[in-house]
């Protein structure tokens, strides 16, 4: 195999199915942008606590990796505090990324005043979305357990859970999310959110 002009320093980054190689590359690129991260590990923190599990609960509160646009969805985060003194005013946050690394939403419990004085032992944080606006695609959830001001990281789990959003009856075919809007023409509703899931 001969190198093409301008590619004499090319390096083979991976072998396998195209999707898998691209996923691995995009994950490495995204991680390398985070401050204090080595660009390889998917978890880091001071070890005072750990996120045990990330789940998506679909209709019926059942764990799943496949949901539909418009479904009621709960993002569940199980944690364990390892420090015997507990964590003072901790904050859980999570990021929802598209497969190419684009951040769709960053949610932080502090913004909704869900910050306990002290956190000990094991427990669960649930974040429920009544009508999931995401359109068809593959998404990753990352989670972090930090101090109240997000200056100290106890555990950060990057891309801890991947899930698929499957098609539903919505009228947007482009972009990342459904607006669940309705069209009116001359004062009459002609199509829209009423006919979605």
What positions do the PLM features span?
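Localized sequence-composition bias
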Residues: 1-197
């Amino acid at each position: 195999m001969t190198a093409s002009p301008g590619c004499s320093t090319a390096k083979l980054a991976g072998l396998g199915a195209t999707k898998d190689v691209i996923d691995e590359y995009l994950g490495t690129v995204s991680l390398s942008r985070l401050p204090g991260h080595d660009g390889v590990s998917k978890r880091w923190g001071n070890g005072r606590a750990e996120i045990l599990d990330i789940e998506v609960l679909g209709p019926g509160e059942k764990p799943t990796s496949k949901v539909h646009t418009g479904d009621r969805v709960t993002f569940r985060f199980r944690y364990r505090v390892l420090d015997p003194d507990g964590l003072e005013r901790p904050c859980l946050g999570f990021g929802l990324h598209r497969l190419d690394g684009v951040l769709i939403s960053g949610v932080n419990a502090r913004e909704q005043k869900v910050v306990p004085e002290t956190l000990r032992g094991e427990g669960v944080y649930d974040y429920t979305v009544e009508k999931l606006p995401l359109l068809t695609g593959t998404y990753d959830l990352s989670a972090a357990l930090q101090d109240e001001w997000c200056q100290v990281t106890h555990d950060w789990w990057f891309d801890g859970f991947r899930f698929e959003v499957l098609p539903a009856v919505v009228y947007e075919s482009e972009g990342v999310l459904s607006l669940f809007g309705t069209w009116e023409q001359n004062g009459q509703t002609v199509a829209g959110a009423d006919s979605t899931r």
